Curated annotation (Swiss-Prot):
It comes from the Bacteria. The gene is crr. The active site is at H85. The keyword Kinase applies. Its main location: cytoplasm. This is PTS system glucose-specific EIIA component. It comes from Bacillus anthracis.
Length: 165
C-alpha cells in the first residue's frame, strides 16, 4: 500500500537523455540527410558540435561501436536504445580522425567520454559535422520529448526525455 501511495519501489520507465556533445541542438528534420530527417533510423535530435568529444547521454551499456568509430549505440537502463552518429557520410573516413574510449559491452555513466574526433578533419572530408542522436527503438517508446533551439553542454543539458511503454 505505501509503495503505491508514495511511489516507493516503483521502476520508472522515463529516461533523461543529456547532450552527448557541446553545440547547437536542432530538430532531427533539419539534418541534411533524408534517412535521419525522415526519422527512418528513429526519432531524436541533432547537435552541430563545437568540439570533438562525445560523452554518454545516459547511464547504460555500450551495445555497438562501429569499427570506423564514427557511430556508437548505447542502451539505457530503461531499455531506450540511442544511436549517436558523428557527422554525415563520416563512414567514408574509415576511422581517420576518430578515437574510441570505450568498447562494446562496457557499462557507462552519463558524462563518460565515449569518442573523440577531429572536428576540422570532419569539416574538410565529410558532408557535415551535424550529429544525429536518435532513439532506434522508437516503436517501444510511449513518448519522446525533445528540447531544440538551445546551445547544449555535453553531459549536462537535457535534450530528450524518453518514456518507454
Amino acid at each position: 500500500m505505501f509503495k503505491k501511495l508514495f511511489g516507493l519501489g516503483s521502476k520508472t520507465n522515463e529516461e533523461t537523455i543529456v547532450a552527448p556533445l557541446t553545440g547547437a541542438v536542432k530538430n532531427i528534420e533539419e539534418v541534411p540527410d533524408p534517412v535521419f530527417a525522415g526519422r527512418m533510423m528513429g526519432d531524436g535530435v541533432a547537435i552541430d558540435p563545437t568540439e570533438g568529444v562525445v560523452v554518454s547521454p545516459v547511464d547504460g551499456e555500450i551495445v555497438q561501436l562501429f569499427h570506423t568509430k564514427h557511430a556508437i549505440g548505447i542502451k539505457a537502463k530503461n531499455g531506450t536504445e540511442i544511436l549517436i552518429h558523428v557527422g554525415l557520410e563520416t563512414v567514408k573516413m574509415e576511422g581517420e580522425g576518430f578515437e574510441a574510449h570505450v568498447s562494446e559491452g562496457q557499462a557507462v555513466k552519463a558524462g563518460d567520454k565515449l569518442i573523440s574526433f577531429d572536428l576540422e578533419l570532419i569539416r574538410e572530408k565529410a558532408k557535415s559535422t551535424i550529429t544525429p542522436i536518435v532513439i532506434t527503438n522508437t516503436d517501444a517508446a510511449e513518448s519522446i520529448k525533445t528540447t531544440v533551439g538551445v546551445t547544449a553542454t555535453k553531459g549536462s543539458t537535457e535534450v530528450m526525455k524518453v518514456t518507454m511503454k
